[in-house]
Amino acid sequence: MSYFEHIPEIRYEGPQSDNPLAYRHYDKSKKVLGKTLEEHLRIAVCYWHTFVWPGVDIFGQGTFRRPWQQAGDAMERAQQKADSAFEFFSKLGTPYYTFHDTDVSPEGSNLKEYSENFLRITDYLARKQESTGIKLLWGTANLFSHPRYAAGAATSPDPEVFAFAATQVRHALDATQRLGGDNYVLWGGREGYDTLLNTDLVRERDQLARFLHMVVDHAHKIGFKGSLLIEPKPQEPTKHQYDYDVATVHGFLLQHGLDKEIRVNIEANHATLAGHSFHHEIATAYALGIFGSVDANRGDPQNGWDTDQFPNSVEELTLAFYEILKHGGFTTGGMNFDSKVRRQSVDPEDLFYGHIGAIDNLALAVERAAVLIENDRLDQFKRQRYSGWDAEFGRKISSGDYSLSALAEEAMARGLNPQHASGHQELMENIVNQAIYSGR
C-alpha cells in the first residue's frame, strides 16, 4: 500500500466547491495574459519540508511517522521516499520538484559512499521523472546540517571543510544537469558569523567568492544551461549571513565579477526577516537585473524566525506577481513551495491541504495582478509622476549635460521654486484593493 493510496488526484472544481481535496481557483489550463496558469506559475514542491522534515522543533522530537523515516536500509528508504514523493507530485498535478542532495540520498560515512549513493538515487530519480513527466526545477547541496559546517562551508576556517563542500556541490550540480534541472541554487545557510570576535571578514568573503567562481567554472565546463541562483537570507542559523538580502547579494556579485553569472532565488519569509516586503525584494531584483526564481511561503509576523508556512495572503502575492508579470514572467525560475505543514498536522491529507490552498492563492494572485497590468492605472500614474524627467530639462540632467555648478546656475537663471505634488498613495492602495476584491 502506498502512503497516499487513499487520496484521489486533485482536480479543479471551481470556487463553489466544498471539497477540501480539490482546486477552487487553480485551473491550470486557464489563460491569463496569453499564458496558462500552469505556465505562469511553474509550481514546484520541495523535498525537504514535505518528505524529510520529521516534525521536530527545538523543544520536542518528531511528530510525523512517515514510512520512509522508519528504521531499515538507508537506500531502500530513499527509494521509498522517492516513490511517495512522485506519487504526491502526480496526484497534486504539480509539474516540478526541488531537492538538496541529502534530501534524496543517504549521506553515507565518507565521500565515497556519499558519491555512490547519490549516483544511484540520481538514476532512480531520472526513471521517476521519465515515467511521470515531472521535472526538476532546481537542485542544491545541503552545506549546513552536518556538524562539519558549524562554522560555514565556503567560509569555514578549515580548508578541508571547504573542499568537502566543493565535492558536494560538484556532485549536486552534476546531478541537476543529469536530471535536466532548470536552475541550481546556492543557499549559504551558515555562510556568515555568530560573533565578529573570532571572524576574519575579509578572508571569509574572499573564500565565498572563490567558491562561487569555482561553481560558475564547473557549470560552464559541464555545459549547464540553467541559471545559477543565490538565495538571500539575513540571519538564522547564523547571527549575520553574507547573503543578507537582494541588494547585498548584488553588491557582492558586482564586487567579485559574478553579476553576469548568478541571479537570486527570493524567499518570501527571508525577505521579511531582512525587514523588507516580498514585493520589495522582487522589485529590487528586477531593478538590478538579477531576478531568477521564488520560494513561496510566509512567516508569522509575531515570530522573529523562519516559520516557512504556506502562503495565504492573496494581497501580498498579487503585488509579487504584479512585478513578475510586468517583467515578462519566469524564464528558468518558478514558484517553489519552501513551505511545511505545522508540527501538529500529522495526517497525509494535511500535506495536500497545505499545497492546495497555497496553489489556489497563487492562481488568484496571478489573475488579480493581470487586472492591474491590463487597467494600467498604477503605471499611468508613475509615468505622469516622473514625466518631468522625460521632458528636455530632465533628459539633459539625466544624460550628464550639466555639471553641479552649471545646474545650480540654470536653476538660478530659471528662478526655480518647485512645489510638491501629491503622491496619491491612498488612491494607489485603493486601486490595488479594487483589483483584488472586485476583479477590476
UniProtKB/Swiss-Prot annotation:
For whether the record's keyword set contains NADP, the answer is no
The cross-references to InterPro entries, in alphabetical order and at most eight, read: Xyl_isomerase-like_sf (IPR036237), Xyl_isomerase-like_TIM-brl (IPR013022), Xylose_isom_bac (IPR013452), Xylose_isomerase (IPR001998)
Q: Which UniProt keywords apply?
A: Carbohydrate metabolism, Cytoplasm, Isomerase, Magnesium, Metal-binding, Xylose metabolism
Q: Where is the signal peptide?
A: none
Gene Ontology CC: one annotated term: cytoplasm
Does the record bear Thylakoid in its keywords?
no
Locate the residues binding Mg(2+) 2: 267, 270, 306, 308
User: Which Gene Ontology BP annotations are present?
Assistant: D-xylose metabolic process
For this chain's record, the cofactor binding note is:
Binds 2 magnesium ions per subunit.
> Which reactions fall under this protein's catalytic activity?
alpha-D-xylose = alpha-D-xylulofuranose
Co-factor(s): Mg(2+)
* Annotated residues for binding of Mg(2+) 1: 231, 267, 295, 338
Where in the sequence is the active site?
Answer: 100, 103
- Alphabetized Pfam families for the sequence: AP_endonuc_2 (PF01261)
> How is this protein organized at the quaternary level?
Homotetramer.
Family, similarity comment: Belongs to the xylose isomerase family.
The protein's name in its UniProt record: Xylose isomerase
Q: What organism is the protein native to? A: Paraburkholderia phytofirmans (strain DSM 17436 / LMG 22146 / PsJN)
Recite the lineage of the species.
Bacteria, Pseudomonadati, Pseudomonadota, Betaproteobacteria, Burkholderiales
